[in-house]
Curated annotation (Swiss-Prot):
Residues spanning the membrane: none
Stated name of the protein: Peptide chain release factor 1
Purpose of the protein: Peptide chain release factor 1 directs the termination of translation in response to the peptide chain termination codons UAG and UAA.
PROSITE patterns registered for this protein in UniProt: RF_PROK_I (PS00745)
Primary location group: cytoplasm
Entry superkingdom: Bacteria
Localization per Swiss-Prot or TrEMBL: Cytoplasm
Cellular component terms (Gene Ontology): cytoplasm
Length: 354
């Protein structure tokens, strides 16, 4: 393990020299790429350097054990240093885990009403508000790309971009089926209904990630329409793009400008195609190692929100919290952090077994 760390430390020193090179600084794409690599290694190198200092301090204190006057102080210091050594070893192991290259990216968020009719559409709206408020706390920007509103409120489907630093790292484990149990406002008997929505979190594709041949696209334009089907625009500003090789279809009508709608639709199209490729790769890797850590399987029921009990349960990690109002208001940091910690430990176990 330490041979690998020392190799990475040498690379870190090499990067520090490169980032002060005028030729690299003048090449902004290369400078940004090397800066990201440098930032990724900073935590590991700092932890390893502190670890080496702790080992040196422990050796110095062991030498003091032979001194009667210094023995008691040295023993106390060794105890503290041993605890720090163990903590640093765990931290270094975590920092050595392969980093998801998508973690720093913005995302495309898709929420679709599933079983449960109107109640499911209302819950889709609740989930969108929950993620929007969590985004506000993290100072991320949320922009609706397309929305199919339900006549009784909420959404049959809503697609939005969430832009900011480390969005995918925090939201990637939200993909899956979210189940809600509550009494609908129209339920006279007070019976609890169960409905569900699916959430998809996809790392936003960048131009360098995927190249789409324009001849593979079929682009249709039409008039925008509202929730009841009425036309709300007198020009053909809405855009529907079909990627012929995969059959992927994306429509956008949120903007008054056809150019802006086309740009938004292309962003979603590229992201979906890249996500599909990555899902296939993940499935192949999972088949190879017989398990998939943090798969984000879209068909998996990941969470239940029980309103009568004020309870949220995440079924993947057995986490239950009785503060549903706060969670629906966007206070999901505890859930996000617990999921990230769980899947880091799973990855660590898988790495130690290989």
């Amino acid at each position: 393990m330490f041979d690998k760390i020392e190799e990475l430390e040498r690379r870190y020193q090499e990067l520090e020299a490169l980032l002060s090179d005028p030729a690299v600084i003048s090449n902004q794409p290369e400078f940004r790429k090397l800066s990201r690599e440098h930032a990724d290694l900073t935590g590991l190198v700092a932890a390893y350097r502190r670890y080496r200092r702790v080992l040196e301090e422990m050796e110095g204190n062991r030498e003091l054990l032979a001194d009667v006057d210094m023995k008691e102080m040295a023993e106390e210091e060794l105890k503290v240093l041993e605890e720090e050594k163990e903590r640093l070893e765990g931290e270094i192991q975590m920092l050595l885990l392969p980093r998801d290259p998508n973690d720093d990216k913005s995302v495309i968020l898709e929420i679709r009403a599933g079983t449960g009719g109107d109640e499911s559409a209302l819950f889709a709206g609740d989930l969108f508000r929950m993620y929007s408020r969590f985004a506000d706390v993290n100072r991320w920007k949320v922009e609706t790309i397309s929305a199919s509103e339900s006549e009784r409120g909420g959404f049959k489907e809503i697609i939005a971009s969430v832009e900011g630093e480390g969005v995918f790292a925090k939201l990637k484990y939200e993909s899956g089926t979210h189940r809600v149990q509550r009494v609908p406002e129209t339920e006279a008997q007070g019976r609890i209904h169960t409905s569900a929505c699916t959430v998809a979190i996809m790392a936003e594709a960048e131009d360098v990630d995927i190249d789409i041949n324009p001849t593979d696209l079929k682009i249709d334009v039409y008039r925008s329409s509202g929730a009841g089907g009425q036309h709300v625009n007198t020009t053909d500003s809405a855009v529907r793009i079909t990627h012929l090789p995969t059959g992927t279809v994306v429509a956008c009508q949120e903007e008054r400008s056809q150019i802006k709608n086309r740009a938004k639709a292309m962003k979603v199209l590229k992201t979906r195609i890249m996500d599909s490729i990555q899902q296939e790769q993940n499935a192949r890797m999972a088949a190879d190692r017989k398990q998939q850590v943090g798969s984000g399987d879209r068909s998996e029921r990941i969470r239940t929100y029980n309103f009568p009990q004020g309870r949220m349960t995440d079924h993947r990690i057995g986490l239950t919290l009785y503060r549903l109002d706060a969670i629906m208001a966007g206070d999901i940091a505890e859930i996000v952090d617990a999921l990230r910690a769980h899947y880091q430990m799973e990855a660590l176990k898988a790495q130690s077994e290989e």
